[in-house]
Amino acid sequence: MARRRDELEDTFMYAVKEIYYTLQGEGAQTGRAAVFCRFAGCNLWSGREQDRATAICQFCDTDFADTNGPGGGKFASAEELADAIAAKWRDPAFPSPEIGTRDTHNAGPSTPAARAASAQEPGSFREFVVCTGGEPLLQLDADLIAALHDRGFEIAIETNGTIEALPGVDWICVSPKAGAQLKQRSGDELKLVYPQAGADPAAFEDLPFRHFLLQPMDGPQREENTALALKYCLEHPRWRLSLQTHKLIGIP
């Protein structure tokens, strides 16, 4: 089983599947430009198809095994990884030729100090990184949080909630999984893949989150699951429907 960064030996390297620039495709931040840093490894599934049937999470639709994706690799320090993430924002070759490439002439200040200062200006925006996986909290640590903040980034995580987030994370999205103990019980959004046997949305409604979202489970029953999620949101208006828009428009 994967271990947390602070439980590993001094020779630990951040293992990252891929780093890329795109739009957030789901949840409360849908449509927002972001650098995605997908960490390798998860504590609810190995990422190998031969293990799926015995995994706690059997419906994962993400390839997070190994470090062989675009921009991926092993990074020896938080500074090195933060630089790799910042480079994707400064010079983002948008990965979908059908959509086009982003104009980098208006990409914003080019140095960490200038970017951090500009984020404080009225009407400005902060560069945005989404730490995802796999399970990002197996590796995201205080050093990396500090290094990303030094470069002006707002930090979001997409977590299964089985590990408590460290201080300094700016946006916490928890996606609970049936059969896994929920330890991160507060945050900005709770995004529940629906339907899940053993994960009733009503069981999470008293938790202190700002946004509650139902996301239809992908796969062969996607249309049926979408109809069920739509019906639930109409009957329980606290919940909002989250669609995977990146899949609909063909971007990562």
Model segments located where?
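A broad structural signal for short, well-ordered beta-strand segments within beta-sheet-rich domains
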Residues: 15-16, 32
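Short, intrinsically disordered, charge-biased short linear motifs at domain edges
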Residues: 27, 38-49
